[in-house]
Amino acid sequence: MKGKRILVVSQHYWPENFRITDICAGFAADGCEVDVLCGLPNYPKGEWFEGYRYTGPRRESHAGVQIFRAGEIRRRGNTSLRIFLNYISFPVTALFNLPRLHGRKYDAVFCYETSPVLMMLPAVVYAKLHRVPLTTYVLDLWPENLYSVMPVRNKALRAVAAGVSHWFYRRSERLVAMSPALDERLAAIAPRAQRTVVPQYCEDLYAQDVHDAALESRFAGRFNVVFAGNISPAQNLPLLVECARRLKAADRRDVHFVIVGDGMSRDALEQEIAAADVADWFTFEGQHPVTDIPAYHTMADALFAALNA
C-alpha cells in the first residue's frame, strides 16, 4: 500500500472516540497518504468539543492524516429531531465539500459506515465521478440498525428504507463485514461486491488485570455488574432497570450496576431509573479514557452486553 493515496469518508473522527482514527493512523504508518472527509466533533453529547464550532476549524492534521471537516447540525439535546437533522446534514454538507478535494487524486475511497447509511453519499459520489474503487466497512447494517432503535412497522416505509440502504451497499466494489454472519447478509444484498471479514479489534491492554485499590474499595461488598461502552438505543440498557425493579421487590441490595461511558440515551436511562425509584442500584461513572476500562473490568463480578433484537 506504500505510496497510495486514500480518501476516507467518515462522519465521526478524532477527537471523537471512533476506531477509524486508529485505522487511518495505521494507513499513514504503512506509507499511505490519507485524507479524511468528516464532520465536526459533537458525539455523543451533541455539544461541540472544546475548540470547535460550526464554523470550524475545517482543516486539520492528526497523526499524519489530513482532515477536511464539513459542517453538520449538532445533536444538541439528542432529541429525535436533532438526531434526524444531524443524520441528514452531514452527507449533504460533505457532498458540497467535495470540490475542496479538487486536484488531490486518490487511488481508493474508504468509507467507515456508521449510522445512518446516508453518510455513504459523498463517498459514493466521489468514487463514481473519479472512477476509483470504493471500499465500505459496514459497522451498522441498515435498515436493520434503524429498526433496532425505531420500530418501523409500515410496510411501505420499510420497503423504501431497504431499497435506499441496499442501493448504497451495491455501489461499493468491496464490502468489509465485522463477522461471518454480517458477511452472509451483505452477500445477499450486494452479490457482485467483493467481500471480506475484518472483526472489530480491541487493544492488548484489555487482556490485562488492573487492580485499582481505590476503585475496588468504592464498590466492595456487592456483586458488581459493569457495562462499559456507548449508551445508545441499540444497547438494551433498560433491561438493567427491570432487573433493578425485581431486585428491589426482593429486597436484594447486594447487586449493583456500574455504568461506564456516555451516549445519546444516558439522560433517558437516568430518567427511567429515577421513575422506577431504583437509583440506589446504579452508579454512573461517566466517560473515561480507554486506559481506565481494564480496572473496571477487573473490579467487576460480571460484565453486561446486550443489544435490542
Predicted regions located by residue number:
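Acidic anion/phosphate-binding donor-loop and adjacent secondary structure
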Residues: 187, 201-217, 221, 236
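Carbohydrate-associated surface elements
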Residues: 40, 181, 198-201, 287
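Acidic donor-binding loop of glycosyltransferase active sites
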Residues: 173, 297-309
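Conserved donor-binding/catalytic core segment of Leloir-type glycosyltransferases
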Residues: 214-235, 240-245, 258
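An aromatic- and histidine-rich active-site surface loop
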Residues: 17, 83-98, 108-139, 143-145
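N-terminal subdomain of nucleotide-sugar transferases
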Residues: 1-60
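Membrane-proximal helix-turn-helix segments that form the acceptor-binding/catalytic region
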Residues: 118, 125-130, 155-175
